[in-house]
From Swiss-Prot:
Co-factor requirement: Mg(2+); Mn(2+)
E.C. designation(s): 1.1.1.38
Entry keywords, A to Z: Metal-binding, NAD, Oxidoreductase
Matches recorded under HAMAP family: NAD_malic_enz
GO biological process assignments: malate metabolic process
Protein name stated in the entry: NAD-dependent malic enzyme
Active site (UniProt): 101 (proton donor), 172 (proton acceptor)
Complex and partners: Homotetramer.
Gene Ontology MF terms: malate dehydrogenase (decarboxylating) (NAD+) activity; metal ion binding; NAD binding; oxaloacetate decarboxylase activity
Site (Important for activity) residue list: 267
Region forming the signal peptide: none
C-alpha cells in the first residue's frame, strides 16, 4: 500500500502539530482532523488543497525582487510545512533550482549567521567531541537514511564559511527530495563545526559558530573518525555524502571511508559522474567516443583530478590501455601543466602528471607550461574548467582550440556564476555556434546567427539524487566506482541531443524524476552485481524504486490514544 494513502497515527495534538514541519498541513487540515487534533480556531475557516496553498505561496514568492529574499522565503516554508515546500518547488523546478541551490545558496551561506531564523539539522562542534552520540540522539529525524555533512571549509568557490556552510547540506538534501524522491523524513544535514580561519567570521559578533581557528592534523582526523563511528552506531544503513571539504581533507577522507561505510564525496565523485555523463552525451552527438578525445583541465584539485580519473576509467572501458588514456589527459593548475618532474605534487595528482619525455618536443616547452601552450601543443578536443578563477578561458584560447577541432567540447564548470571560466555566450560566439557547452551554474539560452542554443547545466543534481534513490531501493552497503560509472552512462542515455540530434546536452529539469529513476535502476543493478546488495529481480527492483519515491502529497492523520 502506498504510504501516501495509509493514514499516519499521531500521538500529539494542538499547536505542536502546526510547529512540526514534516507533519503540518496548515489550511489543508480537514474538519475531522481539526476536531480530533484540537486545531479548531487555530486556522482560518477555509479548507484548502495543497495546490491552492502552492498557488498562494507562488504568488507571494513572485513579490520578492531579489534571489536571496526568494531563497529565505522558500526556506521559511520548508521550516514550517515541508510537504507544501516540495510541492511548490516541484511545480516550478526549473525556476526555483537556482534559488534553493547554486548560485543563490552561496549568498545564503555567507549571510547564514546574520539571517538565521530557525534550527535545521545538527551542528556538531569540536568542544562537544565527547558527546557526539548524545547529539545524534537529539535529532528530530529518527529514521535517517541520507546524511549530507560538511565542515564548511570550501563552500562552492567562496572558501571558508564556517557553520555558514550548513546552507549546502540543507540545499543538497532539498534536491535529494525534489529530484530523487527521497522522503524529507529520511534526510539529515550536519555541519562539523571545527572552527574557522575566516577572519571576517572570527571578528563578526553575529557569527554563531565556534569562534576558534580551525583544528587540523590528528585532532581533526580523530574528530571525524568519532563522528563516522557514531553515525554508524545510530543509523548503520545511512548513506553519508561528504560535501565541500577542503582539498587537503576531501580525498583522504574519501579514501579512508569509502570501503568502510556507505559513503561518497559529491564534489569529487558526483561531479565526476555528471561530467562523464555529459561528455558521453556530447561525444555521441559529435559522432565520436570518449577514448578518441584529448582532454585538458584547468584546475587540478581534488574535483578536477576526480573527474579526470573517472574519464580515464571510462576510456579504458571503451577499449584503450590505461597508460594511453592518461597520455590523453592534461592537467593545468596555477603553476602550469602537471609534469612528472614537478616537486610537491599531491598523491592524486602524480598519476595524472605528463611524463616529461613525452612533451620535450612541444613548442615553448618549459617547467611552467601555460593553458594556451597546452591547447596549441596537445590540441585538445575537450576543455574543462574547475579552477574557480573567472575569465581564464580567453578568446585566444577558445579560438586556438576551435582551429584544430570542428566541434570543441567546452565545460566551464566553476561555481557560482561569478567564478565561471568563460560564459556560454562568449564561447558560442567565438566558435560561431560550433562548441558543445555545459556549465556548472545556470545560464540563459544563447542566440548565434538566429539559432538558439540551450545551455546544459552540468549540475550534480542530475546524479546524486538518483544514486541515493538507487542505494535506498537496493539496500546497498557501499557506493562503488562501478556504481558511479553506471550513473554516468544512465545519464548519457537520457540526453535529448544525443537521442534526437537536437536540444540540450542534458535533460530538462522537468524530466528529473524520470532521469533519477533511470539512474537509480542502473546504480542498484551494479550494486547487486558487485554483491553490495541482496539479489532481486529487475521487476522487484523497479518496484522498490517506485516504493521509495516520495511525492509531495498530504497524508491522512489519525489520533492515537494518549
Amino acid at each position: 500500500m502506498d504510504d501516501n494513502k495509509r493514514p499516519l497515527y499521531l500521538p500529539f495534538a494542538g499547536p505542536a502539530i502546526l510547529e512540526a514541519p514534516l507533519i503540518n498541513k496548515g489550511s489543508a487540515f480537514t474538519d475531522e482532523e481539526r476536531i480530533f487534533f484540537n486545531l479548531e480556531g487555530l486556522l482560518p475557516h477555509v479548507i484548502e488543497t495543497i495546490e491552492e496553498q502552492a498557488s498562494r505561496a507562488y504568488d507571494q514568492y513572485k513579490n520578492f525582487t531579489n534571489d536571496l529574499d526568494k531563497h529565505i522565503y522558500l526556506r521559511n516554508i520548508q521550516d514550517t510545512n515541508e510537504t507544501l515546500y516540495y510541492r511548490l518547488v516541484q511545480n516550478h523546478i526549473t525556476e526555483m533550482m537556482p534559488i534553493i541551490y547554486t548560485p543563490t545558496v552561496g549568498m545564503a551561506c555567507e549571510r547564514f549567521s546574520k539571517d538565521y531564523r530557525r534550527n535545521r539539522g545538527l551542528f556538531i562542534s569540536y568542544p562537544n567531541k565527547d558527546r557526539i552520540d548524545d547529539i545524534l540522539n537529539n535529532s528530530t529525524r529518527q529514521k535517517v537514511k541520507i546524511i549530507v555533512v560538511t565542515d564548511g571549509e570550501r563552500i562552492l568557490g567562496l572558501g571558508d564559511q564556517g557553520i555558514g556552510g550548513m546552507g549546502i547540506p540543507i540545499g543538497k538534501l532539498s534536491l535529494y527530495t525534489s529530484c530523487g524522491g527521497i522522503s524529507p523524513a529520511y534526510t539529515l544535514p550536519i555541519t562539523l563545526d571545527v572552527g574557522t580561519d575566516n577572519p571576517h567570521l572570527l571578528e563578526d559578533p553575529m557569527y554563531m559558530g565556534w569562534r576558534n581557528p580551525r583544528i587540523g592534523g590528528e585532532e581533526y582526523t580523530e574528530f571525524v573518525e568519532a563522528f563516522m563511528q557514531a553515525v554508524h552506531r545510530r543509523w548503520p544503513d545511512a548513506l553519508i555524502q561528504f560535501e565541500d571539504f577542503a582539498q587537503k581533507n576531501a580525498m583522504p577522507l574519501l579514501e579512508r571511508y569509502k570501503d568502510q561505510y556507505c559513503c561518497f564525496n559529491d564534489d569529487i565523485q558526483g561531479t565526476a559522474a555528471v561530467t562523464v555523463g555529459s561528455l558521453l552525451a556530447a561525444c555521441k552527438a559529435a559522432g565520436t567516443q570518449l577514448c578518441q578525445q584529448r582532454i585538458t583541465f584547468l584546475g587540478a584539485g581534488s574535483a578536477g583530478c576526480g573527474i579526470a580519473e573517472a574519464i580515464v576509467a571510462q576510456m579504458v572501458s571503451e577499449g584503450i590501455a590505461e597508460s594511453q588514456a592518461r597520455k590523453q589527459v592534461f592537467m593545468v593548475d596555477r603553476w602550469g601543466m602537471l609534469q612528472s618532474n614537478m616537486p610537491n605534487l599531491l598523491p592524486f595528482q602524480q598519476k595524472l602528471a605528463q611524463d616529461c619525455d613525452d612533451i620535450t618536443n612541444w613548442d615553448n616547452f618549459s617547467e611552467n607550461i601555460s593553458l594556451l601552450d597546452v591547447v596549441n601543443n596537445a590540441k585538445p578536443t575537450i576543455l574543462i574548467g574547475v579552477s574557480g578563477a573567472p575569465g581564464l578561458f580567453s578568446e585566444e584560447i577558445i579560438k586556438a582550440m576551435h582551429s584544430h577541432c570542428e566541434r570543441p567540447i567546452v565545460f566551464p564548470l566553476s561555481n557560482p556564476t561569478s567564478r565561471v571560466e568563460a560564459t556560454p555566450k562568449d564561447i558560442l560566439h567565438w566558435t560561431k555556434g560550433q562548441a558543445l557547452v555545459a556549465t556548472g551554474s545556470p545560464f540563459e539560452p544563447v542566440v548565434v546567427d538566429d539559432i538558439t542554443y540551450e545551455i546544459a547545466q552540468c549540475n550534480n543534481s542530475y546524479i546524486f539524487p538518483g544514486i541515493g534513490l538507487g542505494v535506498l531501493a537496493a539496500g546497498a552497503e557501499r557506493v562503488s566506482d562501478a556504481m558511479l560509472m553506471a550513473s554516468s552512462r544512465a545519464l548519457a542515455e537520457c540526453s535529448p541531443l544525443s537521442i534526437n540530434g537536437e536540444g540540450s546536452l542534458l535533460p530538462q529539469l522537468e524530466d528529473i524524476h524520470k532521469v533519477s529513476k533511470h539512474i537509480a535502476f542502473a546504480v542498484a543493478k551494479v550494486a547487486i552485481e558487485e554483491g553490495h546488495a541482496l539479489p532481486t529481480s529487475d521487476e522487484l527492483l523497479s518496484q522498490a524504486i517506485e516504493d521509495n519515491f516520495w511525492t509531495a502529497e498530504y497524508r491522512r492523520y489519525k489520533r492515537t490514544s494518549f
